[in-house]
């Protein structure tokens, strides 16, 4: 016969979270799996700024002002801080329903919809809530098994429901939602200023050197400047345009997802219930509102059970604690922190209880040598065969 050995290992909850995210630094850093475009963003920003600091800043600091490279460094540090803050943070992922919660929601839906005849299409799973005298529909997510809160949506790339979902941005390698939208906007705004700043002083650098060396010779002597001008020129339009678009959305207290779907415009002409009808109030709510905590317990602890079989002569070995008096010691095992829902209730106390109800009672092996009171000795439970 064989014995079943059950081992329990303490793990972090982020290791078992569903979805298509990657975690680093013991769950503190959260990103999407597709990070190739994010690395390209880092390369373009760091590479362009490095060329600017190496070639233009020394010349401009001597001929114009030493404040030029200082301001460029401060702006570069702010851009990188906002980028990493956007990329590495939880955008507002909503936890999926537990099996018990999902079953309860299913029972509520069946009770509300009644019996659906065979062949009929079931009604849509929607709840209506009222926000500022406006009816807003809460849609049911078949993946997360929850009714999504207002303005939440399911990201198909990260496979998670995100609160106040704006869009999934591959350039930052993460979703943009309730918890990192302001940092995303500050990143695009500061990156626009940095791009304009570098582009302008690249032109100034070329003009100043052309006075002494000529325009053609200057271009030959400064190939790094030419490369910076090209990168900044083609980047400027997209970054500045993106910043302007999000400035427009913030003034209306609207998300990119709502703008694409036409939630508050179009034929119905439904008013936006989240807008304060004031640009300043909308901007203050989006950019200066409170920072919401993450609802994902990423670094929480959980027990993971793993079973393995080992050859045994009709006995199962279970670790127990030995008391100071071996003669009065009963067979015990530590109770699990997280009970196994697949274990029947009548089978759970078979080892943990002090008295056994079955006919075959556990027998304890006596140690051949004296041991300390805190030592752990195996208790052998014989399996009855008929």
Curated annotation (Swiss-Prot):
GO terms for molecular function: protein-cysteine S-palmitoyltransferase activity. Its main location: endoplasmic reticulum. It is found in: Endoplasmic reticulum membrane; Golgi apparatus membrane. It is an enzyme of class 2 (transferase). One of its GO terms (biological process) is positive regulation of pyroptotic inflammatory response. InterPro entries: Palmitoyltrfase_DHHC, PFA4/ZDH16/20/ERF2-like. The DHHC domain is required for palmitoyltransferase activity. Belongs to the DHHC palmitoyltransferase family. ERF2/ZDHHC9 subfamily. This is Palmitoyltransferase ZDHHC9. It comes from Danio rerio.
